[in-house]
Amino acid sequence: MEGGGRRVFSNYDLQQVTSSSTTIQENMNFLVPFEETNVLTFFSSSSSSSLSSPSFPIHNSSSTTTTHAPLGFSNNLQGGGPLGSKVVNDDQENFGGGTNNDAHSNSWWRSNSGSGDMKNKVKIRRKLREPRFCFQTKSDVDVLDDGYKWRKYGQKVVKNSLHPRSYYRCTHNNCRVKKRVERLSEDCRMVITTYEGRHNHIPSDDSTSPDHDCLSSF
C-alpha cells in the first residue's frame, strides 16, 4: 500500500523477513562453531610442536579418536622405515665395493711385487759377475798367445782412441771365459787385456809364447 511517496509494508511481510533473518542467523550459528573448532584444532597441534613440522588430523575408521602425525622423516628414521634401510644398504654396498677395491689393489700389488722381484734377481745376477783380471803388456800384436783358443765375436770404437776394442770368447765347450783387448789411448804400444771369468779346463799344449806361464796362471 503506497501513499505520499512512501512504501508501507504489511505485518506479514515484516514477519516473513524476520523469520528469514532468524533462519540465516541460526544457520550461521550452526556453521561458525564447526569452523572455529577446526581452526582451533589446527593451531593447537601446531603450537604444541613448535620445532617439528606441521601436522594434520588422521581419522581412524574403527574409532572416533583423532591422532596427529607430523610430516617429515622422523618416523622413518625412528621406526627403521625405508629411508633407514636404504642407508644401511648403501653402507653395505660401500663396504662391499671397498672389499672389491682392496682385492684388486692386492692383486695389483702382488703383480708389481713379482715384477720387482724379477728386476732384483737381474740386478743380483749383474752384481754376481765373474771376476775380472787385467794385464797390460807392451806388444806390437793385439792378441797375445796365452795358451787358450779364442774366437772374436765383436768390436767397438773407443772414444778418443785410434784403435778399436775387440771382444773374444773361449772356444772350449762349457767355458764362459771372455776377454777384451784394446790399446792404451795415451800410449798405443801398450796392449790392455781384460779377462772375465775362470777357465774350467787346462790350456793347450802347443803354446810357445813366453807370456804363456804368466797369462795361464789365473
UniProtKB/Swiss-Prot annotation:
Residues 64-77 have a biased composition (Polar residues). It is found in: Nucleus. The keyword Lyase does not apply. GO terms for molecular function: DNA-binding transcription factor activity; sequence-specific DNA binding. Residues 139-204 bind DNA. One of its GO terms (biological process) is plant-type cell wall biogenesis. Disulfide bonds: none annotated. Its main location: nucleus. Keywords: DNA-binding, Nucleus, Transcription, Transcription regulation. Residues 49-63, 105-116 have a biased composition (Low complexity). The keyword Transcription applies. Transmembrane segments: none annotated. Residues 49-120, 199-218 are annotated as: Disordered. GO terms for cellular component: nucleus. Pfam families: WRKY. Transcription factor. Interacts specifically with the W box (5'-(T)TGAC[CT]-3'), a frequently occurring elicitor-responsive cis-acting element. Belongs to the WRKY group II-c family. This is Probable WRKY transcription factor 12. It comes from Arabidopsis thaliana.
